[in-house]
Amino acid sequence: GTKIIRSAHEMNGPIDDIPGRLAKMRITGFEIPKIACMPRNLTDVTRMFQQAATLEPGQQILCAMGPLGLPSRILADKINSYLTFVSPPSAEKLKSIGHIDPLTMNKIYDFRAIDKNTDIYGIIGYPLEATESPTIHNGGYRNHGMNACYIPIRCETVDEAMNFAKITGIKGLSVTVPHKESILPHLVEKSPE
């Protein structure tokens, strides 16, 4: 039968109990509940990933909005989301709320190939607006036939990035400004080079 998308948008922060809110949105059984929220920090995005891990795949749509929420759009499969939302390349103003265009999603991040077995890597920094690292790394992964994806992870602190990496199973991180020195206590091995 036909299903409808029943949406809940929270523009002022995260939704604390995502599974509970989804359950309340399932009224007739013909809904695909959608939750979109505006995270205040990467910790809010991490909580979404944690809660999403308890959900049945493909039975809901989840999205953290804004630049902080970009990982939830790219890694929709990893948060058991039925789909993700993109915008036309001409919609520049939508980038401020974390929208990404479908060409970038597929050409840079190889979105359609991301699955539960995809190894995730990333770059952490703030504000992380002009990095070419995903283009370079994801191109290399494709050239070597690797099931891997490299994503930008906008974070104000190294601690929240390390927690996000732990919760999401990220295999490795590159570090850029302003975290190049604050990452040092988290390193297992250091050298003068």
Where are the predicted features?
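Catalytic alpha/beta core domains of metabolic enzymes, predominantly
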Residues: 2-117
